[in-house]
């Protein structure tokens, strides 16, 4: 028996004993108090997984019987078992002590005390009661400030209103029933901290959420109270939304009959009066259906009487005070179920009219009868009026409507509207008028193909630039097909936050009905590969999509370039994408888990399910390995726990995958890769900068770095086999003189053949065989590495012939007593770059020779090996001005013209000088030499990138994982692993 089962069994006995000893039973509050007095601890609800006492006792039907009590209370009585039947019969024969019961009620303040006439009907059956409007307004007032966790709800309610929230007073058994009854104003979102109660900002019909996998926008979509522009489609006061199959409510059909009977009376009215009458009819129907229908007609007349006394308008903040002065009674919006007076006025749009005038910070309320509405001229003004009628619940104010609505409607659309409005059946069939008007406008727009000027008719998004090898990034796994085929999204300020900002702007723009209708895509533009945007019906956010396939029945299959998944949407929901929303590259990156392959030919369902559980909806740390056929092969690590969890290790341990030392091309992406099909590539920012400056890109040096001798390849494979297979630790280390550690300093090597003079590198040479013998003698944690291409620093120019300038790097001889005793030969490294042809090729350019000198402190005497004329090098420190990477080659390789000549040497860099001198000389033909000495500051000596040393152990990143971004500020320290051409 587990610990939890033992606690539950003991709790059942204790609760039965408490309830049996009480003849009349106990309420849930009394049970909690009696248990605390008897045991000394509270009920172990959280340990057993319960959230309330009622939930606990309902899970014990053989121990507790729930009985309704007086005043809507709940009484808990015990159900005796075989061993307690005798005790229960003795307790039942006892006399009931009325004095004790009365003293118990007097001793504690009861929420049910009061006259019998005010007691509620006992709660019977399983049908939850209705939450009173006063309580609902209190809940809205509490959650309007900020969301509240369910565990902190009682504390927050007591702090706000000075009393505890007694839900049983209203006939509810638990908070679950309260939240279900208030589901129209409160939404519950599951978070890591628990259930989060949030105030719904809209009040339309709630629908199940079905957005692309991994997105963080989880608020449900509901209609706003008082916002009638998004109510029933037929009852909208604007003529802009196309409607196909409409089933009008019964109330609207009755209004149709009323309007038919009044055809004779209204036939003499002019065109403008007919439109005004139609608009007022719609408003009255909406008011009866909406929240205003709950207000009594007597109260409406009183409010209208107060407002009518101010023909020039009454400030909305003074409405309650004027009402109290006239009728000598208070008007409380909260008792009517409204959050404030503004929401109350917005619900009474059939009798009140609201305006906002410049120069006033408050809204003006008018009597709808005495303040006639201005004549209807366009859809724009009608939409503005609908927005003004309910300002607190509408996300767009009047000023926002004026800014976001398309301000320049075409003349071609105005003329058909005027012609259609002249039809004689305008008043007789108002619903048909709206449908025909919308259809005519839509057909006209499609016929003329009048698209907005800032819409994107034919354009492709750019992909994110390739990531640097061995860089650490924070990622979200958005869409998973298999461990070899999934999409990630980078978690950083330059990617995820920009995407969120763009989606908020898109929602703000396209949520305006006039703007949304203006950007409707005609049928002729709906073609595969077209970039557009869509709002899925279950969500309230707008997404960038690319049309993948055109299906039957007015449906299309679209690809989400920011999340990686494919979905089916309606053609009518597609909208043109504004040009400003195409600047952000597609955020989804196709990936494959590095170094793994399935045990069988394909991934099993268990392996895919395990990989989905590992990813979850949380930020992970990704270690970039390489790109294979344009697909990023990446290691994934979960750092949320105390120990780092590498996904490829977990899949191998559970028998789902085989770990190999190479990356296999993904079969799924080779069959279909929508991102590569519909987007264009974008070069890395560093390569673009280098190309603009006239220098070769990093890829050029990387390609040159591949050209190594066969002997060097074999040597490197020997080193690679000796490197431990564990993943490296994730601590970041800066390279500086003050914290230098020579145990893991990379051994530098010289460059072999190079096609371009700019690709020659300056390093000290290494003895081929001695180099590796030294590595074996070193401790296991000290490994030989070569600097990769990602250590390039744009602030330094590559050596060689750059823009007609010759660059030489010298190491001056430093005279000292220690050098004479050790007999160490100092070398001078010089690059010969066909100087004779430079003057003829570039006669107008003056030759310069740059000499880079570095002051160093000499080390102790070196150790020479027997039978070897060359001295074994240990660690070599390059200047921080080293422009590019180096490659280890054999010393016996052929040295062509233009290569680096050097001799063996020993440099033990225990301490470096705190200054670096850069000397510039003019051409040797000039007798005068101008020298400029630059002393680099301490900040310049430290490398501008963070490096991570390799080790067999791993360390938890913790919060540092959130700092890993796509800027490649974190790098593994260089490895000898190479990519074959």
Swiss-Prot record:
SUPFAM superfamilies: Tudor/PWWP/MBT. Its main location: cytoplasm. InterPro entries: LOTUS-like, OST-HTH/LOTUS_dom, SNase_OB-fold_sf, TDRD5_LOTUS_2, Tudor, Tudor_domain_containing. Residues 7-80, 127-202, 295-369 form the HTH OST-type domain. PROSITE patterns: HTH_OST, TUDOR. Residues 525-584 form the Tudor domain. Residues 819-842, 850-889 have a biased composition (Polar residues). The keyword Transcription regulation does not apply. It is found in: Cytoplasm. It comes from the Eukaryota. GO terms for cellular component: chromatoid body; pi-body; synapse. Residues 98-108 have a biased composition (Basic residues). Signal peptide: none annotated. Disulfide bonds: none annotated. Keywords: Cytoplasm, Developmental protein, Differentiation, Phosphoprotein, Repeat, Spermatogenesis. The modification Phosphoserine is found at residue 892. GO terms for biological process: P granule organization; spermatid development; transposable element silencing by piRNA-mediated DNA methylation. Residues 98-118, 808-908 are annotated as: Disordered. Belongs to the TDRD5 family. Required during spermiogenesis to participate in the repression transposable elements and prevent their mobilization, which is essential for the germline integrity. Probably acts via the piRNA metabolic process, which mediates the repression of transposable elements during meiosis by forming complexes composed of piRNAs and Piwi proteins and govern the methylation and subsequent repression of transposons. Required for chromatoid body (CB) assembly. This is Tudor domain-containing protein 5. It comes from Homo sapiens (Human).
């Amino acid at each position: 028996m587990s610990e939890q089962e033992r606690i539950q069994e003991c709790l059942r006995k204790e609760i039965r004993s408490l309830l049996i000893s009480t003849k009349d039973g106990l309420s849930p509050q009394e049970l909690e108090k009696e248990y605390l007095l008897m045991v000394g601890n509270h009920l172990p609800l959280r340990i057993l997984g319960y959230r309330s006492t009622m939930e606990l006792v309902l899970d014990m039907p053989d121990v507790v019987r729930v009985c309704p009590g007086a005043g809507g209370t709940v009484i808990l009585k015990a159900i005796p078992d075989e061993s307690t039947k005798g005790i229960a019969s003795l307790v039942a024969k006892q006399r009931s002590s009325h004095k004790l019961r009365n003293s118990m009620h007097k001793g504690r303040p009861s929420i049910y005390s009061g006259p019998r006439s005010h007691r509620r009907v006992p709660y019977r059956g399983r049908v939850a009661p209705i939450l009173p409007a006063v309580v609902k307004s209190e809940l809205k007032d509490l959650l309007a400030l900020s969301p509240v966790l369910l565990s902190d709800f009682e504390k927050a309610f007591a702090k706000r209103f000075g009393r505890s929230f007694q839900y049983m007073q209203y006939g509810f058994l638990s908070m679950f029933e309260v939240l279900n009854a208030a589901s129209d104003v409160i939404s519950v979102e599951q978070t890591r901290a628990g259930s989060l109660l949030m105030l719904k900002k809209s009040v339309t019909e709630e629908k199940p959420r079905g957005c692309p996998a991994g997105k963080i926008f989880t608020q449900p979509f509901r209609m706003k109270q008082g916002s009638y522009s998004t109510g029933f489609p037929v009852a909208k006061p604007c003529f802009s939304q196309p409607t196909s199959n409409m089933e009008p409510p019964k109330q609207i059909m009755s209004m149709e009959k009323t309007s038919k009977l009044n055809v004779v009376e209204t036939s003499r009215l002019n065109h403008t009066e007919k439109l005004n009458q139609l608009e007022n009819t719609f408003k009255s129907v909406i008011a009866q259906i909406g929240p205003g229908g709950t207000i009594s007609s007597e109260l409406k007349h009183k409010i209208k009487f107060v407002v009518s006394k101010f023909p020039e308008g009454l400030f909305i903040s003074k409405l309650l005070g004027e009402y109290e002065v006239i009728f000598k009674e208070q008007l409380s919006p909260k008792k009517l179920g409204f959050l404030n007076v503004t929401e109350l006025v917005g619900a009474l749009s059939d009798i009140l009219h609201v305006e906002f005038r410049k120069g006033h910070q408050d809204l003006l309320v008018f009597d709808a009868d005495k303040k006639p509405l201005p004549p209807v001229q366009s859809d724009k003004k009608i939409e503005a009026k609908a927005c003004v009628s309910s300002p607190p619940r509408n996300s767009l104010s009047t000023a926002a409507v004026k800014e976001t609505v398309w301000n320049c409607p075409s003349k071609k659309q105005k003329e058909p509207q005027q012609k259609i409005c002249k039809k004689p059946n305008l008043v007789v069939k108002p619903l048909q008028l709206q449908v025909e008007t919308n259809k005519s406008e839509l057909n006209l727009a499609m016929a003329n193909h009048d698209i907005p000027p800032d819409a994107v008719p034919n354009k492709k998004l750019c992909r994110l630039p390739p990531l640097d090898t061995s860089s650490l990034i924070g990622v979200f796994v958005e869409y998973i097909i298999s461990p070899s085929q999934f999409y990630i999204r980078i978690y950083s300020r330059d990617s995820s936050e920009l995407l969120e900002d763009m989606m908020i702007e898109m929602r703000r723009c396209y949520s305006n009905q006039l703007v949304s209708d203006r950007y409707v895509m005609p049928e002729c533009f709906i073609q595969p590969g077209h970039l557009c945007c869509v709002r899925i019906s279950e969500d309230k956010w707008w997404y960038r999509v690319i049309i993948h396939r055109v299906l039957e029945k007015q449906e299309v299959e679209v690809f989400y370039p920011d999340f990686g998944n494919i979905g089916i949407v309606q053609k009518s929901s597609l909208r043109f994408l504004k040009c400003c929303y195409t600047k952000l590259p597609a955020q989804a990156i196709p990936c494959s888990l590095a170094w793994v392959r399935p045990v069988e030919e394909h991934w099993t369902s268990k392996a895919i399910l395990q990989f989905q559980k590992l990813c979850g909806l949380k930020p992970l740390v990704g270690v970039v390995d390489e790109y294979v056929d344009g697909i990023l092969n990446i290691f994934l690590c979960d750092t949320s726990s105390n120990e780092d969890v590498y996904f490829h290790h977990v899949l191998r341990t559970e028998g789902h995958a085989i770990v190999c030392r190479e990356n296999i091309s993904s079969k799924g992406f080779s069959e279909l890769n929508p991102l590569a099909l519909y987007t264009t590539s974008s070069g890395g920012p560093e390569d673009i900068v280098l190309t603009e400056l006239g220098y070769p890109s990093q890829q050029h040096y990387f390609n040159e770095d591949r050209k190594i001798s066969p002997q060097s390849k074999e040597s490197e494979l020997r080193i690679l086999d000796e490197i431990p297979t564990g993943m490296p630790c994730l601590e970041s280390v800066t390279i500086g003189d003050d914290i230098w550690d020579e145990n893991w300093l990379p051994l530098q090597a010289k460059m072999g053949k190079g096609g371009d003079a700019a690709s020659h590198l300056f390093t000290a040479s290494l003895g081929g065989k001695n180099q590796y013998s030294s590595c074996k003698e070193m401790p296991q944690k000290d490994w030989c590495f070569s600097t990769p291409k990602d250590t390039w620093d744009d602030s330094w120019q590559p050596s060689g012939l750059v823009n007609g300038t010759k660059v030489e790097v010298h190491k001056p001889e430093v005279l000292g007593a220690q050098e004479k005793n050790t007999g160490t030969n100092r070398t001078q490294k010089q690059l010969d770059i066909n100087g004779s042809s430079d003057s003829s090729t570039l006669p107008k350019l003056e030759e310069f020779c740059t000499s880079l000198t570095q002051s160093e402190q000499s080390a102790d005497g070196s150790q020479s090996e027997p039978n070897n004329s060359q001295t074994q090098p240990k660690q070599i420190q390059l200047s921080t001005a080293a422009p590019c990477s180096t490659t280890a080659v054999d010393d016996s390789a052929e040295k062509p013209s233009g290569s680096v000549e050097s001799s063996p040497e020993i440099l033990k860099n225990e301490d470096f000088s705190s200054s670096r001198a850069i000397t510039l000389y003019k051409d040797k033909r000039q007798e005068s030499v101008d020298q400029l000495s630059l002393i680099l500051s301490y900040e310049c000596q430290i490398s501008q990138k963070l490096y991570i040393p390799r080790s067999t152990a791993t360390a938890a990143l913790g919060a540092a994982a959130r700092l890993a971004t796509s800027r490649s500020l974190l790098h593994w320290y260089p490895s000898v692993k190479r990519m074959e051409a």
